[in-house]
Amino acid sequence: MPELPEVETVRRGLAPAMVGARFARVTLRRPNLRFPFPERFAERLEGTTVRELARRAKYLTAHLDSGESLILHLGMSGRFDVRMPDGSNLSPGDFYLEGALGTPKHDHVVMAFANGATVTYNDARRFGFMDLVATRDLETCRHFAAMGVEPLSDALDGAVLARLFARKITPLKAALLDQRLIAGLGNIYVCEALHRSGLHPALPAGALAKPDGAPTPKAKKLVKEIKAVLTEAVAAGGSTLRDYARPDGERGAFQHGFRVYDRVGHACPTKGCTGRIGRIVQGGRSTFFCETCQVR
């Protein structure tokens, strides 16, 4: 599933085609994706103009001049093919790293804009979805109401992390993946941030808070590394694994800089460490870490 850097990369790729553009025609080629489309979905979009294309955690939100916002979630394999007004295609060739999962038969939503651009949503597995909600109710809607802080925002610092994790015996990695606490972190970047911080993924999350609730030095370092990993990943265009690629069809490059993710048996890249990268399973997901320098 695309994580925060991949979704942010998609947002940046879609913005030139969508921001300031008016929906001329919306074609639905099936009645549902993961969920049924909202009532009168196409009708409510047609004639409206996109004022802003934003991101909340792993979701895209297009704020419309009608007072509603279009929520877009990519699911496991969702992608957008963009055809610009000049006829250039921002998604040429094979979108996927391992085979063309997204064939034209999986083009489920076609959004034609008055400026001549066309954005097509393709989703082979149909785990993605679209919704329309009043913009004023966006933060309290069912998708976002229980969502935690944005990891790249100023709302997350060492003190906030300590407050969120205080007295929790939950394994640190599981706490970081809890979208009710911090919204947008996923398996890849949590593994990478924990390694950079020298923290074991099974460490109790509460260990990052002092008895008085203040953040430990490790809590502050972890926040710093989370922000650094995400920022670097966005700059690299995300990570291409199986189902994710950028809107222009190019593959994200951050996977070439993985220190631990999917590198079992490799030497730890930390200077002075003689350890190897190992793997454990937590919550049904693979966790990659250095068996020597990531301490409990």
Curated annotation (Swiss-Prot):
<protein>
    <recommendedName>
        <fullName>Formamidopyrimidine-DNA glycosylase</fullName>
        <ecNumber>3.2.2.23</ecNumber>
        <ecNumber>4.2.99.18</ecNumber>
    </recommendedName>
</protein>
<keyword id="KW-0511">Multifunctional enzyme</keyword>
<dbReference type="InterPro" id="IPR010979">
    <property type="entry name" value="Ribosomal_uS13-like_H2TH"/>
</dbReference>
<comment type="subunit">
    <text>Monomer.</text>
</comment>
<keyword id="KW-0326">Glycosidase</keyword>
<feature type="active site" description="Proton donor; for delta-elimination activity">
    <location>
        <position position="285"/>
    </location>
</feature>
<comment type="function">
    <text>Involved in base excision repair of DNA damaged by oxidation or by mutagenic agents. Acts as a DNA glycosylase that recognizes and removes damaged bases. Has a preference for oxidized purines, such as 7,8-dihydro-8-oxoguanine (8-oxoG). Has AP (apurinic/apyrimidinic) lyase activity and introduces nicks in the DNA strand. Cleaves the DNA backbone by beta-delta elimination to generate a single-strand break at the site of the removed base with both 3'- and 5'-phosphates.</text>
</comment>
<feature type="zinc finger region" description="FPG-type">
    <location>
        <begin position="259"/>
        <end position="295"/>
    </location>
</feature>
<dbReference type="InterPro" id="IPR000214">
    <property type="entry name" value="Znf_DNA_glyclase/AP_lyase"/>
</dbReference>
<comment type="similarity">
    <text>Belongs to the FPG family.</text>
</comment>
<keyword id="KW-0862">Zinc</keyword>
<feature type="binding site">
    <location>
        <position position="168"/>
    </location>
    <ligand>
        <name>DNA</name>
    </ligand>
</feature>
<keyword id="KW-0456">Lyase</keyword>
<feature type="active site" description="Proton donor">
    <location>
        <position position="3"/>
    </location>
</feature>
<keyword id="KW-0227">DNA damage</keyword>
<dbReference type="Pfam" id="PF01149">
    <property type="entry name" value="Fapy_DNA_glyco"/>
</dbReference>
<feature type="active site" description="Schiff-base intermediate with DNA">
    <location>
        <position position="2"/>
    </location>
</feature>
<feature type="active site" description="Proton donor; for beta-elimination activity">
    <location>
        <position position="58"/>
    </location>
</feature>
<dbReference type="InterPro" id="IPR035937">
    <property type="entry name" value="MutM-like_N-ter"/>
</dbReference>
<dbReference type="GO" id="GO:0034039">
    <property type="term" value="F:8-oxo-7,8-dihydroguanine DNA N-glycosylase activity"/>
</dbReference>
<dbReference type="Pfam" id="PF06831">
    <property type="entry name" value="H2TH"/>
</dbReference>
<dbReference type="GO" id="GO:0003684">
    <property type="term" value="F:damaged DNA binding"/>
</dbReference>
<feature type="binding site">
    <location>
        <position position="125"/>
    </location>
    <ligand>
        <name>DNA</name>
    </ligand>
</feature>
<keyword id="KW-0238">DNA-binding</keyword>
<keyword id="KW-0234">DNA repair</keyword>
<dbReference type="InterPro" id="IPR020629">
    <property type="entry name" value="Formamido-pyr_DNA_Glyclase"/>
</dbReference>
<keyword id="KW-0479">Metal-binding</keyword>
<dbReference type="GO" id="GO:0006284">
    <property type="term" value="P:base-excision repair"/>
</dbReference>
<feature type="binding site">
    <location>
        <position position="106"/>
    </location>
    <ligand>
        <name>DNA</name>
    </ligand>
</feature>
<keyword id="KW-0378">Hydrolase</keyword>
<dbReference type="InterPro" id="IPR015886">
    <property type="entry name" value="DNA_glyclase/AP_lyase_DNA-bd"/>
</dbReference>
<dbReference type="InterPro" id="IPR012319">
    <property type="entry name" value="FPG_cat"/>
</dbReference>
<keyword id="KW-0863">Zinc-finger</keyword>
<dbReference type="GO" id="GO:0140078">
    <property type="term" value="F:class I DNA-(apurinic or apyrimidinic site) endonuclease activity"/>
</dbReference>
<dbReference type="GO" id="GO:0008270">
    <property type="term" value="F:zinc ion binding"/>
</dbReference>
